[in-house]
Structures are given as structure tokens and as C-alpha cells.
Design a protein with these regions (language model features):
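Aromatic-anchored helix/helix-loop segment that forms the rim or "lid"
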Residues: 224
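Catalytic alpha/beta core domains of metabolic enzymes, predominantly
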Residues: 90, 97, 104-197, 203-221
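Active-site beta->alpha loop and helix N-cap motifs at the rims of alpha/beta catalytic domains
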Residues: 2-105, 138-141
Length: 224
């Protein structure tokens, strides 16, 4: 796993050198029943230099700008997560360009299609002074019966000349997606808690795993 950076999808700080960053979204934060600031500040205090992607919860430009200013005032190594489109399906590239031109690190999220990737490539003010993450929602793409690897490989190839741009495999569904992402050339993959808990299974002896599974089923049957 040294070929890709693993970001944890959540705010439970892990004492684990494999975790290189953290990401959040409004759905994840909802379960904590706290304000965004109260959730983020303790993480920044513990990990001031670790990349932390925080998604805005606004849908119009003025509200997004106001929210971004508030988030950046907290310090830390913040990436502002902006969806590629708003709830009306309109591109957010104007506000994203605005942030990039201010040398604010951005994570473009909720990316699903080649059209969106091409729109990013053709319309963004990309330079070497700011850092940009492009988050492809691979798991949700796979849910539709389409391989996300095609889009990920295309995106990696398209942006390969930009050392400040990283492609992220998001919406991870299973441990093997880590190796899918590596094979695509992705720089980062996010993993939720249920995948993090399974990392210890990597490299496990399959014959032993088979035996343990049979034992588990027998125990379950005996308890009926």
C-alpha cells in the first residue's frame, strides 16, 4: 500500500502511519450532532500538518465563499471540498477557479463522468502554485454497473503533467478497491471505517480464512 496514499473517511483520528489524510462530507458529519467547527478544531489541533478535506454545505456562490472563509480561519492543512455541480446541475467551476486563483487548496468532489473531467481540464485555472484533488466517486459509479477504472485511468493520464494535481478514488466499497486504485494510477483512496477494519485481512491465508468461515457458520447454526 506504499504505492497509494490512504485517507480516512471520517474524523476519528487513527494512530496509524498508513493513514495520510482525512476527508469529510455533510452525511458523515451528521451522525456526530455537533457543529462543523467543534468537530474540525480538535482534529486540526492533533494533526496540524495532515491534509484534511472539508466539504462546504452551501449551494450558492456567496454562501460558499462565506463558508470557505470561516473554514480557512481555523488553520491546518485544509482542502476545501467543492462538488463539481450544485443541486441544480450547474457547474461550480467558477467558484472553484476563484478559490484556486487565491491559492486555496481544493478537492473537487462528486465527480462521476468523463464529461465532468473534460470540463475540469478545459475550464480550470490550473497552475503549479495551488494543490488540487479530483475525487472520482468510483463506488457509486460501480453501483450502476460501469467500471470506474476506465474513468480513473483516463483522468490520471489527462492530468499526468500536473504534479500538483492528485486523483482520488472515492466512495470505496471493498478492500480490493485499494488495488484497483493503484492499478489505475490514482494517488489517493479514501476508506470508511468498515473498510479500515478489514485492512488486517490483506495477505491473509485463504485456506485458513476458509476454515474460519466454516467455523463461523457452524457456530451461527448451533445458536438457532
Amino acid at each position: 500500500m506504499d504505492k497509494i496514499k490512504i485517507y480516512y473517511d471520517g474524523l476519528e483520528v487513527k494512530d496509524d502511519i498508513r493513514i495520510k489524510g482525512y476527508t469529510t462530507n455533510p452525511t458523515l458529519l451528521k451522525k456526530y450532532n455537533k457543529s462543523l467547527k467543534d468537530l474540525i478544531l480538535p482534529v486540526i489541533k492533533k494533526l496540524p500538518n495532515t491534509p484534511l478535506s472539508i466539504e462546504v454545505n452551501s449551494d450558492d456562490s456567496d454562501s460558499i465563499i462565506s463558508e470557505v472563509q470561516e473554514i480557512l480561519s481555523w488553520g491546518g492543512n485544509i482542502y476545501i471540498k467543492i462538488p463539481i455541480i450544485n443541486t441544480k446541475g450547474e457547474l461550480n467551476l467558477k467558484i472553484i477557479n476563484n478559490l484556486l486563483n487565491q491559492n486555496i487548496n481544493v478537492n473537487i468532489t462528486c465527480v462521476f463522468s468523463k464529461l465532468q473531467i473534460d470540463q475540469i481540464f478545459n475550464n480550470l485555472s490550473i497552475n503549479s502554485y495551488n494543490k488540487l484533488i479530483i475525487s472520482i466517486f468510483s463506488g457509486r459509479i460501480a453501483d450502476t454497473g460501469i467500471s470506474p477504472s476506465i474513468l480513473c485511468k483516463y483522468t490520471v493520464e489527462l492530468f499526468k503533467e500536473f504534479s500538483n494535481i492528485e486523483i482520488l478514488w472515492a466512495s470505496t466499497r471493498e478492500v480490493y478497491n485499494i488495488f484497483d486504485a493503484i492499478n489505475c494510477g490514482c494517488h489517493i483512496i479514501t476508506i470508511p471505517e468498515q473498510i479500515y477494519e478489514k485492512l488486517s485481512l490483506i495477505g491473509k491465508d485463504l485456506n485458513k480464512y476458509s476454515k474460519e468461515t466454516v467455523q463461523q457458520f457452524i457456530l451461527a447454526g448451533q445458536s438457532l
